[in-house]
Amino acid sequence: NLSYEDLNFSIFNSSLSLKNVEVSPKDSTSINDSIKFTGKVNEINIVGINFIKLIVQKEVSAYSININDPLVNYYLKDTKDSIKEKKRDIKVGDRFNVSNLNINNGEFNLYSPAGKRHLANVSNFDINFKGVRFNERTINKKIPFGYADFEIKLDSMFFVINMN
């Protein structure tokens, strides 16, 4: 599910912005059924977007994407579940090419499968990627996108070393 409060775009400036964005898995009766992550973002700004490629080819092609104040909560899978997740197929034409992808003032939390234990936190981080590409060749890789260069800065982090 994707929701947002405000969407602005300018064809003349080739820009698009979303405010107060929330991402979550489809509704489910149990946290273990579907939730792998939830996310909230204060603002997403896309500059130099090619609207023709976006509409016609379903390809996001832009000069830069700035993601401001994201909060991501990730839930580990239950270790008892030995069923391997099926790799999802991507339609040819679903592509993402961006010169600069910047994540500013982010926070990441890692939780146990049921969400009862807080296992890790990384706060106040910035990640800057250059030459980001996502396509049918990268979707099934461990890191499902390619990049030319990246830089990470962070303020603080904690990890639970022993879960027992």
Please give the residue ranges for each predicted region:
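Long, acidic/polar, low-complexity amphipathic helices and coiled-coil-like
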Residues: N45, I49, V60-A62, F96-G106
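Elongated, acidic membrane-bridging lipid-handling scaffolds
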Residues: N1, D6-I11, K84-N164
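N-terminal beta-strand/beta-hairpin edge segment
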Residues: S3-V60, N68-P70, R137-I143, D149-N164
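Outer-membrane beta-barrel translocator domains and adjoining extracellular loop/strand segments
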Residues: K77-K80
